[in-house]
């Protein structure tokens, strides 16, 4: 059984929008398993679809660099201890230099990026250590992702905290940026409904069948309602089915 910590309760509150006591009770009953707690809350009708996990709570910034031909881009996350430092020009300058160097070297693993050489001849690791001495906070290159496109590539960073890269077949950079902006705002899980794993569909069906308004209904009615709700679920999580955020 995992410990029900304040951080776990906070995460569940952020993902469900429920109160502290409801979240704590759900986590205790789920023995500290946050995904199980979310499923139980949805089955009981207390919570709707929860936000997906995966966005780090650490402070920092995301920097993007795009190749000269516009066909390849990299996105790098650099973490700091405080938001104050994350907005510092020295920190942001370091993040942009790391992104440019990592793109040129085609490196995405933090350990590999550390050894990449910057324009001034120093390595990323040496520059990181110098920045730590200057700013007085721990700075970490956390992760990176690189993407290449056949036709056009879109990049979008929201508030320095959420970054998206989108590869298109056809279209142009403006369309790519619009799609990336939509992804940042709505966070689809897949591009097309057909990409949703069968295990995810079965889990969703189990949750829907357990909801209070399904109790006591004839099997054929339950199946009809289930079909409608699954279609709604697929539209909500699939990029091509979502209403465009700018409309």
Swiss-Prot record:
<dbReference type="InterPro" id="IPR036402">
    <property type="entry name" value="EF-Ts_dimer_sf"/>
</dbReference>
<dbReference type="GO" id="GO:0003746">
    <property type="term" value="F:translation elongation factor activity"/>
</dbReference>
<feature type="region of interest" description="Involved in Mg(2+) ion dislocation from EF-Tu">
    <location>
        <begin position="82"/>
        <end position="85"/>
    </location>
</feature>
<keyword id="KW-0963">Cytoplasm</keyword>
<comment type="function">
    <text>Associates with the EF-Tu.GDP complex and induces the exchange of GDP to GTP. It remains bound to the aminoacyl-tRNA.EF-Tu.GTP complex up to the GTP hydrolysis stage on the ribosome.</text>
</comment>
<comment type="similarity">
    <text>Belongs to the EF-Ts family.</text>
</comment>
<protein>
    <recommendedName>
        <fullName>Elongation factor Ts</fullName>
    </recommendedName>
</protein>
<dbReference type="GO" id="GO:0005737">
    <property type="term" value="C:cytoplasm"/>
</dbReference>
<dbReference type="InterPro" id="IPR018101">
    <property type="entry name" value="Transl_elong_Ts_CS"/>
</dbReference>
<dbReference type="InterPro" id="IPR014039">
    <property type="entry name" value="Transl_elong_EFTs/EF1B_dimer"/>
</dbReference>
<keyword id="KW-0648">Protein biosynthesis</keyword>
<dbReference type="Pfam" id="PF00889">
    <property type="entry name" value="EF_TS"/>
</dbReference>
<dbReference type="InterPro" id="IPR009060">
    <property type="entry name" value="UBA-like_sf"/>
</dbReference>
<dbReference type="InterPro" id="IPR001816">
    <property type="entry name" value="Transl_elong_EFTs/EF1B"/>
</dbReference>
<keyword id="KW-0251">Elongation factor</keyword>
């Amino acid at each position: 059984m995992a410990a029900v910590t304040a951080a776990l309760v906070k995460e569940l509150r952020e993902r469900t929008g429920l109160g502290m006591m409801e979240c704590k009770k759900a986590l205790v009953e789920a023995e500290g398993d946050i995904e199980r707690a979310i499923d139980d809350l949805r089955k009981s009708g207390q919570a709707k679809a929860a936000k997906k996990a995966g966005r780090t709570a650490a402070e920092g910034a995301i920097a993007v660099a795009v190749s000269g031909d516009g066909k390849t881009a990299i996105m790098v996350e650099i973490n700091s201890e405080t938001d104050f430092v994350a907005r510092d020009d020295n920190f942001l300058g370091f993040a942009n230099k790391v992104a440019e160097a990592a793109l040129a070297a085609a490196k995405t693993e933090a350990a590999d990026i550390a050894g990449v050489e910057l324009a001034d001849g120093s390595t990323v690791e040496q520059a990181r250590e110098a920045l730590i001495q200057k700013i007085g906070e721990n700075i970490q290159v956390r992760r990176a992702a690189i993407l290449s496109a056949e036709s056009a590539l879109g990049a979008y960073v929201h508030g320095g905290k959420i970054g998206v890269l989108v590869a298109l077949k056809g279209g142009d950079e403006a369309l790519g940026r619009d799609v990336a902006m939509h992804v940042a705002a709505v966070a689809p899980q897949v591009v097309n409904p057909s990409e949703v794993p069968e295990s995810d569909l079965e889990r969703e069906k189990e949750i829907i069948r357990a909801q209070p308004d399904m109790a006591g209904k004839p099997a054929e009615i339950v199946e009809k309602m289930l079909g409608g709700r699954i279609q709604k679920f697929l539209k909500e999580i699939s990029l091509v089915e979502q209403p465009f955020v700018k409309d």
